[in-house]
Design a protein with these regions (language model features):
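Mature, function-bearing regions of proteins
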Residues: 1-164
Length: 164
């Protein structure tokens, strides 16, 4: 990591009341006061597996999907990341990902996380806990709620590649 940068910052969910789940943890590597690289730790909910995507923030190229995240998305996809890293407190951190079908080149998925950087201290942590006391459960319930809606719409279901 030293040749890439001299500081690492983690963007992740907090553990609430002993419960922890985070579909995406992001490690930003900073060199000379600028974020230069990002390590995205992706978790898939039903299988409790993790995969890592290492990204050069100055050379974000499309790359093949390497990890089965959702049973509603096939593996034959390509990812494109658009990142505005948290270089300072003034500009927002934006993590945007799009996935495209390798067969048709159509966009099949799009997600954006837009956050403002804030200091980590006791008062900020207390405010966060009081404002969102059940964040872990909310995230997990949201994922399963969306999955149920997709099932009811009869969206195709793709088995885990290692389970075939």
């Amino acid at each position: 990591v030293e040749e890439l940068g001299n500081e690492v910052f983690l963007l992740a969910h907090l553990r609430y009341f002993g419960l922890y789940f985070s579909p995406l943890n992001v490690y930003f590597v900073k060199k000379n006061e600028r974020c230069t690289h990002m390590l995205a730790e992706v978790s898939n909910t039903p299988w409790r597996e993790k995969h890592y995507y290492a990204l050069d923030l100055y050379d974000l190229k499309q790359h093949p999907k390497e990890f089965h995240v959702s049973p509603f998305n096939p593996m034959e996809q390509t990812y494109q990341w658009i990142i505005n890293p948290p270089n300072n407190y003034e500009s927002p951190c934006v993590i945007h990902i799009e996935s495209f079908s390798q067969k048709t080149s159509d966009k099949v998925f799009d997600a954006t996380l837009r956050l403002r950087r804030k200091p980590l201290n006791n008062s900020a942590l207390t405010r966060t806990l009081l404002r969102t006391p059940m964040q872990t459960l909310t995230v997990m319930m949201g994922i399963y709620w969306q999955a149920l809606k997709l099932l009811l719409k009869r969206v195709p279901f793709y088995k885990h590649p290692s389970k075939l």
